[in-house]
Curated annotation (Swiss-Prot):
Purpose of the protein: Binds to sialic acid-containing receptors on the cell surface, bringing about the attachment of the virus particle to the cell. This attachment induces virion internalization of about two third of the virus particles through clathrin-dependent endocytosis and about one third through a clathrin- and caveolin-independent pathway. Plays a major role in the determination of host range restriction and virulence. Class I viral fusion protein.
Family: Belongs to the influenza viruses hemagglutinin family.
Site (Cleavage): R344, G345
GO cellular component term, pick one: virion membrane
Record has NADP as a keyword: no
Bilayer topology: Single-pass type I membrane protein
Protein known as: Hemagglutinin
Domain of life: Viruses
Gene that encodes the chain: HA
Cellular localization per UniProt: Virion membrane; Host apical cell membrane
Principal subcellular localisation of the protein: virion
Covalently attached lipid (S-palmitoyl cysteine), positions: C555, C562, C565
Post-translational modification: Palmitoylated.
Disulfide links within the chain: C21-C481, C59-C292, C72-C84, C107-C153, C296-C320, C488-C492
Length: 566
């Protein structure tokens, strides 16, 4: 019996068999991704698809400087507010930057007709030619062109007026009827602006225009309107009780525009031949101009990124990532990062892909760890790793290419009377934005799930490849490991890794060792049966002796009486 127990203990203590394990790479990465089924999965490698940073500056767009209006609004710039004179030298720009609260707009109070539409038109203009449509000195010989100034449009402390308009007044006590036309020979659209003066009282009307009733008529192929001055007292704005209403039209190449009036005309002086450019726009921003270049400009600042999505601002100009409301869009490229606990032993927690990855394997995603008499070591499976890298890289590039539709997204212009339309437009835009955000997030979740499943499948395939080679020359011991029934030196280990393992060569040795182990198991089973019987009998005897002793003690002290009746 003692000899049999000794054999059993010796057999159980033998743990020096050669072993090979299949596992995967792990590192100290803290990157986390979300999948359809899980959140915050730690992975070895990932790529960010969402840009959330900017430089806080206005930059040149593709090397072309923007038109920074400074303290001027679009209206002040295009009408020629004297305080905006420094902007007249700007002939071309990449985009127009306007501050939220521009001081210099329409210096003489009044209504600017279709102002939001004009802004929309100018948002697609990248350059223009400013030219005299009606030269000041020779176009109006019967009218005064110098006295039409006002303190509300002062410049350097003196009364002045818009630099692109002429306020025609009476000359030598009369204001003759006028008729002036212009033919567009610029081969481009020409922007023409004019105004109609509405005095606050009849005395001003007579003093300036020498008549009580007046009209202004403007006609072209696409525009036909007749204006009648409205003489009325109004609240003072910028010191004025009168008003000037401002109007504009786009004159097509070859078209003619005709002005007729007998008073109250604020005549065009300069007009603009427009050149439209793709990617231009108007942004409202407090950011300052800087010496920098970018491909994408937002009101918050410039974005220099090739990522497909951004959450900086919905208004963009240039080649910009698509705006989404997401706070995180990270796509996994590596594996689940579950580093094994080194202290639990080589073939314990770090044995394979079931319990964790290997931080010691740094030259590939999947691979092997072996242990034999010659030592131990890691080796990556380069073929499966490279195939996985190629597949995932192509997928990531494809996703970025499909979603990376870069474009300009500018805000739409609405006036105060179009509030319901603006609110409806915002709801529609919000709906599209929600769809874009949902699609982007769902795409990333699905692709992350597929990538992690892909890695799991690759590890399993590598495991099955080894298992199919070894067959019954080794046994599975869990954790992705196999224990050989034969000695396997480094050459043998290498053959398993590269798929050239010679099964017949090791079959006989494996068979003998397998039978020896099976014999020990059978003998051990017999020993266990004897031990079980012995233990049962010994336990029963101990129980009977204990019961007898208790009964004798109870009878001796009278606690238990035994009567035998015959």
């Amino acid at each position: 019996m003692k000899a049999k127990l000794l054999v059993l203990l010796c057999a159980l203590s033998a743990t020096d068999a050669d072993t090979i394990c299949i596992g995967y790479h792990a590192n100290n990465s803290t990157d986390t991704v979300d999948t359809v089924l899980e959140k915050n999965v730690t992975v070895t490698h990932s790529v960010n698809l969402l840009e959330d940073s900017h430089n806080g500056k206005l930059c040149r767009l593709k090397g072309i400087a923007p038109l920074q209006l400074g303290k001027c609004s679009i209206a002040g710039w295009i009408l020629g507010n004297p305080e905006c004179e420094s902007l007249f030298s700007k002939k071309s720009w990449s985009y127009i930057a306007e501050t939220p609260n521009s001081e210099n707009g329409t210096c003489y109070p009044g209504y600017f007709a279709d102002y939001e539409e004009l802004r929309e038109q100018l948002s697609s203009v990248s350059s223009f030619e400013r030219f005299e449509i009606f030269p000041k000195e020779r176009s109006w010989p019967k009218h005064n062109v110098t006295r039409g100034v006002t303190a509300s449009c002062s410049h350097k402390g003196k009364s002045s007026f818009y630099r692109n308009l002429l306020w025609l007044t009476e000359k030598n006590g009369s204001y003759p009827n006028l008729s002036k036309s212009y033919v567009n020979n610029k081969e481009k659209e020409v922007l023409v602006l004019w105004g109609v003066h509405h005095p606050s009282n009849i005395e001003d009307q007579k003093t300036i225009y020498r008549k009580e009733n007046a009209y202004v008529s403007v006609v072209s192929s696409n525009y036909n309107r007749r204006f009648t001055p409205e003489i009325a007292k109004r609240p003072k704005v910028r010191g004025q009780e009168g008003r000037i209403n401002y109007y504009w039209t786009l004159l097509e190449p070859g078209d003619t525009i005709i002005f007729e009036a007998n008073g109250n005309l604020i005549a065009p002086w300069y007009a603009f031949a427009l050149s439209r450019g793709f990617g231009s726009g108007i942004i409202t921003s407090n950011a300052s101009m800087d010496e920098c270049d970018t491909k994408c400009q937002t009101p918050q600042g410039a974005i220099n990124s090739s990522l497909p999505f951004q959450n900086v601002h919905p208004v963009t100009i240039g080649e910009c990532p698509k705006y989404v409301r997401s706070t995180k869009l990270r796509m996994v490229t590596g594996l689940r990062n579950i580093p094994s606990i080194q202290s639990r032993g080589l073939f314990g927690a770090i044995a394979g892909f079931i319990e964790g990855g290997w931080t010691g394997m740094i030259d590939g995603w999947y691979g092997y760890h072996h242990q034999n008499e010659q030592g131990s070591g890691y080796a990556a499976d380069q073929k499966s790793t490279q195939n996985a890298i190629n597949g995932i890289t192509n997928k990531v590039n494809s996703v970025i290419e499909k979603m990376n539709t870069q474009f300009t997204a500018v805000g739409k212009e609405f006036n105060k009377l179009e509030k319901r339309m603006e609110n409806l437009n915002k709801k529609v835009d919000d709906g599209f934005l929600d769809i874009w955000t949902y699609n982007a997030e769902l795409l990333v979740l699905l692709e992350n799930e597929r990538t992690l499943d892909f890695h799991d499948s690759n590890v399993k395939n590598l495991y099955e490849k080894v298992k199919s080679q070894l067959k019954n020359n080794a046994k599975e011991i869990g954790n992705g490991c196999f224990e050989f029934y034969h000695k396997c030196n480094n050459e043998c280990m290498e053959s398993v890794k590269n798929g050239t393992y010679d099964y017949p060569k090791y079959s006989e040795e494996s068979k003998l060792n397998r039978e020896k182990i099976d014999g020990v198991k059978l003998e051990s089973m017999g020993v266990y049966q004897i031990l079980a019987i012995y233990s049962t009998v010994a336990s029963s005897l101990c129980l009977l002796v204990s019961l007898g002793a208790i009964s004798f003690w109870m009878c001796s002290n009278g606690s238990l009486q035994c009567r035998i009746c015959i």
